[in-house]
């Protein structure tokens, strides 16, 4: 999901430089090769062009609401057993966490799966097929969390240790904080290779 307007950020955060590449590249990497179908739903022409260069399917739209983004994306994925809604502004989400969510879903495909840190649920959220009708008919402006909240008995969480994985970069300050963590981790990785 890459359809936010970036009002609090003050611009197109998806294309903001995150360690030498657009921030959206991080979420594309975290989901690469894991799904039969992958689709970026966005209002950003720049993000759409970047995805096309990487051969990632894109649905470019101009609709204003989160419920519109969910509906458009799910409509394109309706023949799947499950659908992962991943915000594109969560740059520290890892491939390992997304892979673990998929493994959990394979063990219990009737549950709504989401990561949680210290008991606090976050995104992305993996929805099973039974929830598609509710997602397609979300109240105006609501997102998938609305469906999860309506079915708390069917929500399962995957514990993650790093709370930064679940953080959004909604403001320039949050972006700078997450970028700093990313760059420090990259430096540590580089020093281990020496």
Regions picked out by a protein language model, each given a short descriptive name:
Residues 1-121, 151-162:
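Nucleotide and nucleotide-moiety/phosphate-recognizing core
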Residues 7, 48-49, 133, 167, ...:
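Alpha-helical elements of the RecA-like P-loop NTPase motor core of helicases
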Residues 98, 131-135, 175:
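A generic structural signal for short hydrophobic patches within well-formed alpha-helices
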């Amino acid at each position: 999901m890459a359809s936010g307007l970036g009002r609090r950020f003050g611009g197109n955060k998806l294309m903001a430089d995150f360690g030498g590449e657009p921030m959206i590249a991080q979420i594309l990497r975290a989901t690469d090769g894991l799904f039969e179908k992958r689709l970026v739903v966005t209002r950003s022409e720049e993000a759409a062009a970047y995805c096309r260069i990487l051969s990632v399917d894109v649905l470019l739209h101009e609709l204003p609401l989160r419920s519109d983004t969910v509906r458009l994306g799910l409509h394109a994925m309706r023949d799947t057993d499950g659908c992962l809604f991943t915000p594109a502004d969560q740059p520290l989400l890892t491939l390992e966490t997304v892979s673990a969510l998929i493994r959990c879903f394979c063990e219990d495909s009737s549950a709504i799966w989401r990561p949680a840190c210290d008991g606090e649920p976050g995104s992305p959220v993996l929805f099973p097929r039974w929830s598609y009708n509710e997602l397609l008919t979300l109240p105006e402006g609501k997102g998938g969390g609305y469906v999860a909240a309506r079915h708390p008995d069917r929500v399962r969480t995957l514990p993650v240790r790093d709370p930064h994985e679940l953080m959004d970069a909604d403001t320039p300050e949050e972006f700078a904080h997450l970028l700093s963590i990313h760059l420090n981790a990259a430096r540590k990785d580089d020093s281990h290779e020496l």
